[in-house]
Structure formats: structure tokens, C-alpha cells
Amino acid sequence: PYGLWYDEVTASNLVKVNLDGDVIGESEWGINPAGYVIHSAIHEVVEDAQCVIHIHTTAGMALSCLAEGLRTETIYDAVIDGEVAYHDFEGVTLFEAEKPKLVASLGSKKMMILRNHGLLTVGRSIPEAFMFMWRLNRACEIQIAAHGASSNVLPVSDSAIAASKAAYDGLRDGDRHAEKVFNALLRKIDRIDPSYR
């Protein structure tokens, strides 16, 4: 809902739109044109993109400004090593001409760092896209914190990356792992403040 601050957005006031940007149903709010370009670019082309998440966290934006990108220095990085795409900043994302470039940059990956901009993830479900985003943002947070504390940060070895990926693949349990974590977080939100609904 364009015009609401982030803490005012609830599940019930989200604005539904079609791929042409037309609002479906009733809403007193419009949509963010830049958000529409980014989300619709992926939804139009990526067949299994049931959910696209795009955020501007401090850590994600800070890391998106670093030429080196995401380094493999923690367990979070090890699990997603080689699975993060990058898209160069072209200015505020308001133009249809950027849509095919976004899709080309993403390729077959599910996570993308929009350089000088933020983070994006794609999932076959809301829980899957959220899980990818949580891991990607967490990796950014830790890299920014570690490099702020010291220039002597240890990289993760190739064998540890391979072992981490193998262990994670064994835990995936199809989509159920992401669903379990997502549902646990929903229960937590319900306990704290159910007004998000």
C-alpha cells in the first residue's frame, strides 16, 4: 500500500494487482511504481515465482554498495555460496526497459543483490522466499559487522562450504523446512501482536 509507513502495513491492507499493475478489488491505496516494476518483472517470466520479496535493510543496502559483494565467511554464506545473483544499479527502478535485465541478472537463482539498492529473493512459496531472504540478509548483517570489527576476517574453506551445503540439503525436507520455520515465526508474531493480520 503506497502511502503507508512500513509499520502500518498489515496482511489485510495489502494491495493486490495483476501483471499490468491494475489494482484488483477495493483499496484506498495505490502501489509503489518502482516496486511494481521489480516484482512484475520476475512474476511475468519466472514460472515458479509464487513470491518475490524485495527489501532495503541497512545491512543489505550497505553490502550492495561493496564491489566485492557477499563473501563466504560464515555458515550463512556457506549455505548460499554460489547461489546469489547480482544486478547493477540503473537508477530508480521505474522503467519497463529494466525488467528483462532484472530477469537476466537473476537467471536460475533465487537470491539477488541489487547493487547500490537492496536484496531480492524468489520462492515457490512465501515461506521459501522468506527463508532465502532471512539467510541472505543475515549473511549481509554478519559480513558488515565482521568487517567493521576487523580487516582480518577468516574465509570459509571450500571443504566447509561443500559440507555445509550437503548438510543443509539433507535438512531441507522439501518445502517443509521453510514452512516449519515460517509457521513458527507466525506463531511468535501472534503472541507478540496479532494486529498484523
Identify what each model region corresponds to.
Residues 1-197:
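Glycine-rich flexible loops
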